[in-house]
Amino acid sequence: VSIDCSGYPKPACTLEFFPLCGSDNQTYSNKCAFCNAAVEKNVTLNHIGEC
């Protein structure tokens, strides 16, 4: 499973809830929050859903 993070980071994210579990074992609330972290901290996707 991969998430396309082209166009990130963004300055603000919506409050949409679509949890994604990152390789840092942190649950990100949605694609925007995950992609911001992926770009800034080189986090990858472990799986869709909470960690």
Swiss-Prot record:
Residues 3-51 form the Kazal-like domain. The record marks 15-16 as: Reactive bond 3. Keywords: Disulfide bond, Glycoprotein, Protease inhibitor, Repeat, Secreted, Serine protease inhibitor. Its main location: secreted. Disulfide bonds join 5-35, 13-32, 21-51. Glycans are attached at residue 42. It comes from the Eukaryota. Gene3D superfamilies: 3.30.60.30. One of its GO terms (molecular function) is serine-type endopeptidase inhibitor activity. It is found in: Secreted. GO terms for cellular component: extracellular region. InterPro entries: Bifunctional_prot_inhibitor (IPR051597), Kazal_dom (IPR002350), Kazal_dom_sf (IPR036058), Prot_inh_Kazal-m (IPR001239). It holds the Pfam family Kazal_1. Avian ovomucoid consists of three homologous, tandem Kazal family inhibitory domains. This is Ovomucoid. It comes from Eudromia elegans (Elegant crested-tinamou).
